[in-house]
Swiss-Prot record:
GO terms for cellular component: cytoplasm; EKC/KEOPS complex. Belongs to the CTAG/PCC1 family. Keywords: Cytoplasm, tRNA processing. The keyword tRNA processing applies. One of its GO terms (biological process) is tRNA threonylcarbamoyladenosine modification. This is KEOPS complex subunit Pcc1.
Length: 82
């Protein structure tokens, strides 16, 4: 029996649209350039929010995808705070 795909949604709200835009733009390059074979991500900005909708083949792929995006977002925020 083939395992079901795993789905999840993450919404991160920032203090301002400007910060959300900078973080979104920073992470967008990674989103476009890194090929994922085991997951699909709908990555977008909605005002002050960044939205990730993830569909993965299994829980390991989901975990890896979530970890990558959250790490990229954290790095972008850390750079903003320098």
């Amino acid at each position: 029996m083939k395992p079901k795909r795993v789905q999840g949604k993450i919404v991160i709200e920032f203090p301002s649209e400007d910060i959300a835009e900078v973080v979104y733009t920073s992470v967008l390059y990674e989103h476009v350039s890194v090929p994922y074979r085991r997951s699909r991500v709908n990555f977008r900005r909605e005002g002050r929010r960044i939205v990730l909708e993830i569909e993965a083949n299994d829980s390991s792929a989901m975990r890896g995808t979530v970890n990558s995006y959250l790490r990229w977002i954290k790095v972008a925020l850390d750079v903003l705070n320098i």
